[in-house]
Amino acid sequence: TNEEAALTEDQIAVHFASIDEYSAEIERDPNNANAYFGRAMDFMLVQDFSEAIKNFSEAIERDPSFTMAYFNRAVERYKQLMYTQSQQASKDTYDLSGSGMNLNIGKSAQSQVNANTSVDLRSAMLKDNKRAYEHEQIMRDYDMVIKLNPGFVYAYFNRANLRCAQRDFRAAIVDYNEAIERDPEFAEAYYNRGLARLSQGDVNRGIADLSKAGELGMLNLHPN
């Protein structure tokens, strides 16, 4: 599941103690890829995206065939991207509500509106480019996971979800097919493939996939 339970203070303390232990290991042996990976996992569990990504990258630098480091780095990069976007959305909502207070009238006010619009457009383009770059980084990590371990079903599933986020439904369906081929009872893959097919106008097969997901236990997770 993608839902994560909040950690208790005691659990957080355990992870930070573990981080200290891994740090000591790294100090003794700076080339220990497993220590970087372990420390990354602890950072991941305390929701420190940046440090987790940094440590997964350190593990990969020392062991370029470290499949799970690529996979978890992709997961963390996506979580960081989603968090950043949610924070920006909150800020944009606040800015929008605040902008309603500006009731200036006249040429100077109109000029300011035009200038703000121009800045907003440039800002939106920069955000789109940054998001595209971040999606590409995540995609490359999943590509590497699949290259190193072609049977890793969740790499196909997560890559398919990323492609849906990019609205590349055709490519997403191909990846969902690969996931389902490797795990014929993967309910979430049927469900998401059904949504992707519906987005393409493939209604009959889309509904069939949603029904299959329901048979496999997804029905109660997605009530009407």
Per-region residue spans from a language model:
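Alpha-helical tetratricopeptide repeat
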Residues: 1-224
